[in-house]
A protein has these predicted regions:
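Ubiquitin-like/PB1-type beta-grasp interaction modules and other compact soluble beta-rich domains
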Residues: 1-102
Length: 102
């Protein structure tokens, strides 16, 4: 999936982001809509952005803890993000990392 996507050319891209399991509890929401800055083109860069925006729970966005999906298909972290994508972050272990309660 990641290889088949094209570069966006600097257009504004909106995605729908879903959180599951303990990640929904840590973030306090099950989903949100984001407008991606031009610097965020892949799932890895999205996780970097989330770590910066939610620095109190940055450990929760570690790649080793999550399995991403893009448009309901499991995806690699290098998968490019396009306008209208649905991205889900699914924890790959049942217990969350230790982070301060918010």
């Amino acid at each position: 999936m990641g290889y088949q996507r094209k570069e966006t050319g600097g257009q504004e891209r909106r995605i729908k982001l879903y959180y599951f399991s303990w990640l929904a509890n840590k973030t306090g929401r099950e989903s949100e809509e984001l407008v991606l800055p031009p610097s965020v083109t892949t799932v890895t860069e999205l996780l970097d952005l989330l770590r910066k925006r939610r620095y109190q729970i940055a450990q929760a966005f570690d790649e080793s803890l999550l399995r991403p999906t893009v448009n309901k298909q499991f995806a690699e972290f290098f998968t490019r993000l396009e306008d209208g994508d649905e991205v889900a972050l699914v924890p790959n272990r049942p217990t969350p990392p230790a982070t301060p309660d918010i």
